[in-house]
């Protein structure tokens, strides 16, 4: 497969996944903002959202130091100058799909194209302002639809596997950022909190942002504990959005696009996966969760760079 074709496929799925992840964290923040809480807690929640995407400097340059929820929502949803906003991600996903339209099935192309057209219509008509949660659910649904149509109609050849690689590298990156920022915020908020309800809503909101609330209940059958939330989102191989689950998918799909045992990309991915496989959550927490996740993000970024050099078009996207 031509590297440029693989590049477009990789970024098509990566941008679609990024739009979904942004919708997830925005929805949870919006729902949490409706609960009784201090102004400081509310402010920290919205600032944390910008930190997850490393967009605080860009936001501050446009809106100033005061973080207002409405401004954050506009910046992360409809700002076309913000490359990580939902509208920008869906536009970029569609443009990458259009570039390789002949490689995709009709159903996949129509899904990407219709999603882009529909999100523009919804933002112009005021649907987002009338019901933000419904809008975020729609974004998540369209991402699910894109993956489902891809799995249900695409030949499982190299094109299919590059699509999957984009999805799971992006998902691993997002989950690591989410856990890092939310657990860091928890140190400040929960250290002074005596309200058990607050404790519950904080951790349950993290789980809901990755569709993990019901999974947690099924796996642990107990009250929500921070160390178990971390274990679920980092080390559980059967959790769809865990770091280990994502790296398993990355390795499986890499194996389908190269049989070269000396591939540096496969070597790095395999080492990162094995480090997660044999890690224990108590050791991670004892050594410092932030340090662990920072190192993980660095290694994922390096993995993406090696993948680009080996298979894709090595440009900054």
Per-region residue spans from a language model:
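Alpha-helical transmembrane segments and their helix-helix packing motifs
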Residues: 1-317
